[in-house]
Amino acid sequence: MGSSHHHHHHSQDPNSMSQPFASRGLAWFQALAGSLAPRPGDPASLRVADAELDGYPVRFLAVVPDPDNPFPRARQGEVGLLEGWGLAAAVDEALEADREAPRKRALLAIVDVPSQAYGRREEALGIHQALAGAVDAYARARLAGHPLIGLLVGKAMSGAFLAHGYQANRLIALHDPGVMVHAMGKAAAARITLRSVEELEALAAKVPPMAYDIDSYASLGLLWRTLPVETVEVPSTADLVRVRTCLGEALADILGGPRDLGGRLGAANREASARVRRLLREQW
């Protein structure tokens, strides 16, 4: 009851609109897709826009903070119930619309997601199904021939990243300390491994899959490219040119090759994975 009253009050607050959460995801979405407002019918935490990249049709998708999100645990850009199902619907819509089209539009996930939404309501209403719905839609689109590109501009954490971005044929990350990829946030990981955050960081320096920084992640071979930028919070003109060029190259690269995720097994830290796969093939 108290929350609905607060919500009503919030909408009357003249400052609430002028002070949104600072969101890299929204800044890059606006710069690349040229649009700002949510589409009618989409949750305010979801941004979807159709545009072009080098003359090829592209649907841009981003999950952004919404301080008025009806689910309090999804107010800071987390992927929750509305966001998971919203992404699934937006991807499915493109899949259906392009079913007969010779050129399937590219899906470009702009990734800045701190985590999935953790809460009792989320658990009760099936957050795992909402996230799985998004993963499934992206995977089906990729297999149907839609080029998928993930652009990491901020955090790419846990189930949120799996639901939005991870299914991409090509992952591109901005080279910046604020761009972090991990299975879970540092504080949670420290709790679960019974270490302090400092101990965890020391350990991560020796074990690349445990690290958070983008260079360690790049060594695992999942990133197609990392890009330096001048002003990561609000992209400069030079940043935009560089990122657009790279996205165009990624698109051309996808359109010219197979649509599976085999490209990830080329990197140094993935040699063991590639060797295991080869040995398995030889033995079977």
PLM feature segments, named:
Residues 2-5, 12-40, 190, 194-284:
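Amphipathic alpha-helical segments at domain termini/boundaries
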Residues 39-57:
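N-terminal short beta-loop-beta anion/metal-coordinating cradle
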Residues 54-84:
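STAS-typified acidic loop motif
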Residues 60-62, 109, 150:
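Structural beta-sheet core signal
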Residues 70-74, 118-123:
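Short acidic, glycine/proline-rich loop/turn micro-motifs
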Residues 80-94, 125-135, 240-247:
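Well-ordered, non-membrane alpha-helical segments in soluble/globular domains
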Residues 85-118:
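A structural preference for short, pocket-lining loop segments at secondary-structure junctions
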Residues 122-239:
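Conserved catalytic cores of soluble enzyme domains
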